[in-house]
């Protein structure tokens, strides 16, 4: 363990010394990925006013398309109600979950071949496993507290 700690400290010291020996400009340039073939670096004394006049100027109006821009709202209208794919069962319906899961498991024959069909099939398997786990948990809790249903809150 001590060997790894010494190795880690030596590695840290080597990288910090290497970064101290480099000029700061080189460190800055290394941290930014650049394409040198697309860039021409000129100093201030090399650029003349003739070169600037030969450059085509690109204004903001040239960059904007002249086509009509249509912006659609991502908000729902008030008359649209979101629909739940799987409604949340109420406490009274927890007892009949086995029959409900069998009713919702009816799929078309070719539905399992599509991605949506596979997703629906996996969702039904997860729901079935969750229902079984919930039923087993409730039975276990009832066995731990057999008289819990008889307890009434004091008023």
Swiss-Prot record:
Q: Name one GO cellular component term.
A: extracellular region
Q: Which residues are sugar-modified? A: 34
Report which superkingdom the organism of origin falls in: Eukaryota
Which is a Pfam family this sequence falls into? Answer: GLYCAM-1
Tissues/organs with expression: Highly expressed in whey fraction of camel milk.
Residues of the region (Disordered) are 74-109
Polar residues compositional bias, start-end: 90-101
Q: Which InterPro entries match?
A: GLYCAM-1
Signal peptide start-end: 1-18
Q: Which UniProt keywords apply?
A: Glycoprotein, Phosphoprotein, Signal
Phosphoserine carried by residues:
48, 53, 57, 59, 65
Q: Please give the family membership noted in the entry.
A: Belongs to the PP3/GlyCAM-1 family.
Q: Could you identify this protein by its name?
A: Glycosylation-dependent cell adhesion molecule 1
Q: Which organism is it from?
A: Camelus dromedarius
State the organism's lineage.
Eukaryota, Metazoa, Chordata, Craniata, Vertebrata
């Amino acid at each position: 363990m001590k060997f790894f700690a010494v190795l880690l400290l030596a590695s840290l010291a080597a990288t910090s010394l290497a970064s101290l020996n480099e000029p700061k400009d080189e460190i800055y340039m290394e941290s930014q990925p650049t394409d040198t073939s697309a860039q021409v670096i000129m100093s201030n004394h090399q650029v003349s006013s003739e070169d600037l006049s030969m450059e085509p100027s690109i204004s903001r109006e040239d960059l904007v398309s002249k086509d009509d821009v249509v912006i659609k709202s991502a908000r729902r209208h008030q008359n649209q109600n979101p629909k739940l794919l799987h409604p949340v069962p109420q406490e009274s319906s927890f007892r009949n979950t086995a029959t409900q899961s069998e009713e919702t498991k009816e799929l078309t024959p070719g539905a399992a071949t599509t991605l949506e069909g596979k997703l629906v099939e996996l969702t039904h398997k997860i729901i079935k496993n969750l229902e079984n786990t919930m039923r087993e948990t409730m039975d276990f809790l009832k066995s731990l507290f057999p008289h819990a249903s008889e307890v009434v809150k004091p008023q």
